[in-house]
Design a protein with these regions (language model features):
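Active-site cleft segment of glycoside hydrolase catalytic domains centered on the general acid/base Glu
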Residues: 1-70, 74, 89-98, 104, ...
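Structural preference for beta-strand elements that scaffold enzyme active sites
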Residues: 1-3, 46-50, 75-80, 108-111, ...
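Catalytic metal-binding/acid-base residues of hydrolase active sites
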Residues: 7-9, 55-56, 82-85, 115-117, ...
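Short, surface-exposed, polar/charged, turn-prone segments marking secondary-structure boundaries
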Residues: 31-32, 77-80, 107-109, 186-189
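Substrate-binding cleft of secreted/luminal carbohydrate-active enzymes
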Residues: 86, 108-120, 126-195
Length: 195
């Protein structure tokens, strides 16, 4: 699988591909990227193409982006979304958007960037959906997995955790404490392995 761009809700390669003002240029850049992937492939081998935006919990922006993208007849196989609850809405918002994307676009959906803090970081001035503790981090990932696994038509394709191995340095979203000890969140991967 190849992702064309990263979180491209605002376009890419500004100013030429900046959105919303340059949709024609953006579409040309997307087609060029996809064609470049295919041109670099061995005969009869074509990796899946993913388009990734950062609106996991925002159905309206997701709809606007993909509806507009599809008017350009852009061919892709997977929808990628980022989902950080302090930026992208509640788990209910994520669930509603996953259901919408599955029914509307009928493509597998990956959460390509997901994370939650194991110590207080993001929710200093507002209530957190889960405690920002190692156990709260684990509970958050379990809940996100449930949303993905319950996406209609089995189109919830998986989750990628953002930066799990920074070991308590610049991030509290990783899977290890400052001494390198693994946090409880790691057990979620055993619990939710698809067979």
């Amino acid at each position: 699988m190849v992702q064309i761009g990263n979180e491209v809700i605002n376009g890419m390669l500004w100013p030429d591909g900046k959105l919303p003002e340059n949709w024609n240029n953006f579409a040309d850049l997307m087609v060029a990227g996809i064609n470049g992937v295919y041109d670099g492939c061995a005969a009869n081998y074509y990796p899946k193409i993913m388009i990734h935006i950062d609106q996991g919990g925002n159905k309206e922006k997701t709809k606007y982006f993909f509806d507009r993208l599809l008017t350009y007849d852009i061919k892709f196989d997977y929808i990628g979304q980022s989902y950080y609850p302090w930026w992208h809405g509640t788990l209910l918002d994520l669930r509603e958007n996953m259901i919408f994307m599955a029914k509307e676009y009928k493509k597998p959906i990956l959460l390509v960037e997901v994370a939650y803090c194991a110590s207080p970081t993001e929710y200093k001035n507002k209530p957190a959906p889960y405690p920002e503790t190692p156990v709260g981090q684990k509970e958050f990932l379990e809940s996100v997995n449930e949303v993905v696994l319950n996406t209609p038509d089995n189109l919830g394709a998986g989750i990628f955790w953002w930066e799990p191995a920074t070991m308590g340095g610049r991030s509290t979203r990783d899977f290890f404490d400052e001494k390198g000890n693994v946090l409880p969140v790691i057990a979620v991967f055993d619990k939710y392995t698809r067979h």
